[in-house]
Amino acid sequence: MKVRASVKPICEKCRVIRRKGRVMVICENPKHKQRQG
């Protein structure tokens, strides 16, 4: 899980979602997981 100021999709399978007011990226590739913080 990467914590970043700006989250962006890295590949075409990355999905930007909102959970509990946080912007997150979920993907098949675990290295692409990000959340805004």
Swiss-Prot record:
GO annotation, biological process:
translation
Highest taxon above the source species: Bacteria
Q: Does the keyword Transmembrane helix apply?
A: no
Q: Name one Pfam family in it.
A: Ribosomal_L36
Q: Which PROSITE patterns match?
A: RIBOSOMAL_L36
User: Which Gene Ontology terms cover its molecular function?
Assistant: structural constituent of ribosome
Q: Which UniProt keywords apply?
A: Ribonucleoprotein, Ribosomal protein
GO cellular component, alphabetical, reads: cytoplasm; ribonucleoprotein complex; ribosome
- HAMAP family in UniProt: Ribosomal_bL36 (MF_00251)
Q: Which family does it belong to?
A: Belongs to the bacterial ribosomal protein bL36 family.
What NCBIfam families does the database record attribute to this sequence?
rpmJ_bact
Q: What is this protein called?
A: Large ribosomal subunit protein bL36
